[in-house]
UniProtKB/Swiss-Prot annotation:
Its main location: cytoplasm. It comes from Pseudomonas savastanoi pv. phaseolicola (strain 1448A / Race 6) (Pseudomonas syringae pv. phaseolicola (strain 1448A / Race 6)). This is Shikimate kinase. ATP binds at G11, A12, G13, K14, S15, T16, R117, R153. Gene3D superfamilies: P-loop containing nucleotide triphosphate hydrolases (3.40.50.300). GO terms for cellular component: cytosol. Catalyzes the specific phosphorylation of the 3-hydroxyl group of shikimic acid using ATP as a cosubstrate. The gene is aroK. It catalyses: shikimate + ATP = 3-phosphoshikimate + ADP + H(+). Keywords: Amino-acid biosynthesis, Aromatic amino acid biosynthesis, ATP-binding, Cytoplasm, Kinase, Magnesium, Metal-binding, Nucleotide-binding, Transferase. Belongs to the shikimate kinase family.
């Protein structure tokens, strides 16, 4: 396995699960959004404010391409990373892809107090999350080697299921 890549919506647990997986596998953990922030010296909301979503997506595409060239890491991606075909191609080629699925209710609960999510600066975040999931769910599934439900499950249980499901996959 080159890399273990986590995709899914905001609030699915990609960063939390990713850190635990990395610890379990003794691999480095990278979060593409955090790497963008480190490189730019600015947080995601600031990038959205100054460059708009297209500017952020350009940075994201470059970061994903770079991280997917690495070998032996656990990578958590931003929820919208799958929107670009180039990203989906890089993620698929970069290693095993795990789609962490979460219901709208879980996403709302997990993101409610997070001010670092520009797309949720709205009066109705549940509607936005629902619209985003309707568009992105087929794209997550398109590139996923496995789909894992995260609703109301302790992160440790999710990690154990991921490891078990990946062990069942034939090499590629």
């Amino acid at each position: 396995m080159r890399n273990l890549i986590l995709v899914g919506p905001m609030g699915a647990g990609k960063s939390t699960i990713g850190r635990l997986l990395a610890k379990e596998l003794r691999l480095p953990f990278k979060d593409s959004d955090k790497e963008i922030e480190l490189r730019t010296g600015a947080n995601i909301p600031w990038i959205f404010d100054k460059e708009g979503e297209p500017g952020f997506r350009e940075r994201e595409q470059a970061m994903i391409a770079e991280l997917c060239e690495a070998d032996g890491l656990v990578l958590a991606t931003g929820g919208g990373a799958v929107m670009r075909g180039e990203n989906r191609q890089a993620l698929r080629a970069g290693g095993r892809v795990v789609y962490l699925h979460a219901s709208i209710e879980q996403q709302v609960g997990r993101t409610a107090r997070d001010r670092n999510r520009p797309l949720l600066r709205t009066a109705d975040p549940a509607r936005v999350l629902s619209e985003l999931l309707a568009i992105r769910d087929p794209l997550y599934r398109e590139i996923a080697d496995v789909v894992i439900e995260t609703d109301e499950r302790p992160p440790r249980m999710v990690v154990l299921e991921i490891l078990a499901r990946l062990a069942e996959l034939p090499p590629r």
